[in-house]
């Protein structure tokens, strides 16, 4: 895991994405050795250090057989590598995470004519508060640069990314999260008011929405369980017991019953009211899953069943 040496807020003038080698061949070495590395092999390292960009561009113009646009793009990328400040930020992507760093100004030419800059501190895959920067939690307008065919490029939404790395809340996201929490709390109250049969029906719908297939009619054919369900995607069969109100003793009794059946891979005990401490049960019984009121309410929201619940309680 690569962590920053100083968890200080960033305020870069520029942020650049850098592809670390063709096909990512230098990604692992750069991250572990704390460097950024540029290919673009040429005899013009000293010209680049001196800022003689006309000479550099002429080399790449010849290399590109007179293609002005390609030579300009090449030169601009090389120039960024040499000239970005120590306060500017470099990003790359590896194993579905965003990594960022700042680099020392000195550019060092290696024997193969590739060049490196040493990272200040170390590469980081977290924001300054230690939260992982996973690709699935980053705006696609930032992560799309993974498909860039060149080596170095600017990014869209630089202000957004600075906030992301600095661990700052995005106002519209925080507002929506607060609304979602309020909705979930309201759903909890509606769930608590359900008739026991309607509560069972709601849980049946949750399993169905998640892709589980029911083997028998709800609560009709088996005395020991309310739902006998199978997941085609995981190929697991589950024993499901549903109670509006329950006790610790009752849950443990049903766990003993579940263990008497060989055909089930896991058990779900679903309830909305229980006064006892149940925090140790899932640890003691790894294949047993307890769904309390908060968990059920969250699943109702995620499964799109809030309107069904409202209509049932109306």
Ranges and model annotations:
Residues 2-314:
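Mixed-charge (Asp/Glu-Lys/Arg
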């Amino acid at each position: 895991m690569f962590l920053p040496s100083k968890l200080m807020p960033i305020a870069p003038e520029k942020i650049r994405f850098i592809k670390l080698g063709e096909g990512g061949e230098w990604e692992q070495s750069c991250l572990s050795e704390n460097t950024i590395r540029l290919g673009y092999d040429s005899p013009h390292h000293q010209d680049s250090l001196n800022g003689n960009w006309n000479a550099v561009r002429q080399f790449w113009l010849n290399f590109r057989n007179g293609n002005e646009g390609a030579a300009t793009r090449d030169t601009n990328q090389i120039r960024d590598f040499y000239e970005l400040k120590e306060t500017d930020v470099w990003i790359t992507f590896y194993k579905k995470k965003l990594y960022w760093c700042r680099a020392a100004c000195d550019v060092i030419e290696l024997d193969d004519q590739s060049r490196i800059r040493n990272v200040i501190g170390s590469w980081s895959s977290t924001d300054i508060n230690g939260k992982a920067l996973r690709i699935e939690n980053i705006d696609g307008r930032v992560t799309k640069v993974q498909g860039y065919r060149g080596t170095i490029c600017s990014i869209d939404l630089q202000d957004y990314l600075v906030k992301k790395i600095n661990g700052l809340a995005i106002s519209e996201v925080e507002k929506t999260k607060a609304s979602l929490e309020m909705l979930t709390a309201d759903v909890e109250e509606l769930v608590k008011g359900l008739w026991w049969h309607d509560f069972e029906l709601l849980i049946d719908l949750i399993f169905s929405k998640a892709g589980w297939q029911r083997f028998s009619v709800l609560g009709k054919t088996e005395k020991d369980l309310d739902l006998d369900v199978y997941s085609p995607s995981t190929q697991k069969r589950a024993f499901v017991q549903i109670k509006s109100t329950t006790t610790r003793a009752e849950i443990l009794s049903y766990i003993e019953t579940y263990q008497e059946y060989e055909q089930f891979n896991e058990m779900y005990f679903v309830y909305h009211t229980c006064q006892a401490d149940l925090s140790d049960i899932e640890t003691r019984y790894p294949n047993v899953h307890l769904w309390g009121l908060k968990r059920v309410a969250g699943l109702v929201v995620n499964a799109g069943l809030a309107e069904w619940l409202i209509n049932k309680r109306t």
